[in-house]
Amino acid sequence: MKKQWVSSLSGAFAYAFFVFALYAGVRHPYFMNPWMYFPLLCLGVEQVLKGKKGVLLAVVTGLSAWSNFYFFYMLTILTFSYAVIRFGFLYGKRWKSFFHLFLKGCFWYLLGIGLGCVILVPIVFAFSGSARTGGVTPFANTWFAYPLDFYKELLIGYVFPVYSANFWCVLVYPSTAFLGLFAFGKKNRQMVWLLVWFGILSLVLWIPLGGLAMNGFSYVSHRWIFGYSFVMALLLVFGIEHAECIRWKPFLIYSGLFFILAFLFIKNGGSPKR
């Protein structure tokens, strides 16, 4: 996953200043911990998949376990999804390699948990006795779809500064972050795994059951948006890196729709419900 320094720096700055980081970080500094740890966990997984030692994976796992059990749960799911998808596209159906790397990754991951168990174990016991773990909070709608107004705010909130913080769905990405979606094609398939990962996490974001699972099956919440934002930053890097592969017809359609929506957004005073 080596990238040119211009695209890498652009992705790093975008990830650091995405709106969710500013929104959540102001509310509580704990929300910044997973924002920092997740890219390092993915880098640690990448090293294990390439046959290197997983020291970085173990150390960052230990740090994230020390910091906050709640976010450690989300980080574990997101990191596992990254590892499975990356392996699938790196090694295909080589199951012998899968079990070898899986056991190797589990070793370094469990070693990291061992480093953090001094603090993690008491927190787990305290968390198990918390009132928040008493059961699933009822959801007014079906578990497989939000109300229509939520989707209106969510789609517009992808690129426009809309306070669509229902269930912590704070997005507001720069329009250039979607460049990577237009660079995929028959001649450029080495990053298809990123498109698959983006699709899976988008599905998790768009249905209440995904928010429930990512929040420990307690109630619907998408505080894991830091992981989704990391994928958006990677899409930006990929789009800049492969700008010559961008398919211009869908890109022009996207640009036209963006300017139309921007005009309507400004005309309606920034309200997606009008």
Feature map (PLM): residue ranges:
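Transmembrane alpha-helices and membrane-interface helical segments
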Residues: 39-47, 79-87, 179-183, 228-246
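Contiguous transmembrane helix-bundle modules in multi-pass membrane proteins
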Residues: 52, 71, 193-206, 215, ...
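Periplasmic/ER-lumenal interhelical loops and adjacent helix-loop junctions
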Residues: 100-194, 200-222, 226, 266-273
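Membrane-interface helix-boundary motifs at transmembrane edges
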Residues: 1-4, 47-52, 90-100, 183-192, ...
